[in-house]
Amino acid sequence: MDTVVDASVIIAVIANEPTKNQLIKLTQKADLIAPASIHWEIGNAFSAMLKQNRITLYQARQALNAYSQIPLRFVNVELEESLKIAAELNIYAYDAYLICCALQYNSPLISLDKALQRIAQAQNIQVIEVNT
């Protein structure tokens, strides 16, 4: 079954955050999909960590190597539909891409972002619960 995954989940797994094992277990049998924009979100997250001196460039490269090992299929989402969703829900485009992806592929969403979870549920998207 396809499952839409967001950057918060990917970062939690590759950064060995406390939810890592649970996230892996919850997605073990899923085919992970994400809009292509997630690639740039991951890069942005690591550049922010570098800027804040939370990680070194070496650690960022190791994390990117771990990221490349995650079986993730990048999918296209309709830009116009995503912008419509962003406008209607008053959300950022990156979140709208995820909502659009889940709707377009009729797939559940897994995220650690509580606001995104609420928005998805309001759109009748199944949200995979993560205990944080």
Task: Identify the residue ranges that each predicted region occupies.
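Short, well-structured N-terminal submotif of metal-dependent ribonuclease cores
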Residues: M1-S37, M49-R61, Q123
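Acidic, PIN/NYN-like endoribonuclease modules and their adjacent C-terminal/linker elements
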Residues: D2, P35, I99-T132
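Active-site-proximal, substrate-binding regions of enzyme catalytic domains
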Residues: G43-R73, V77-L79
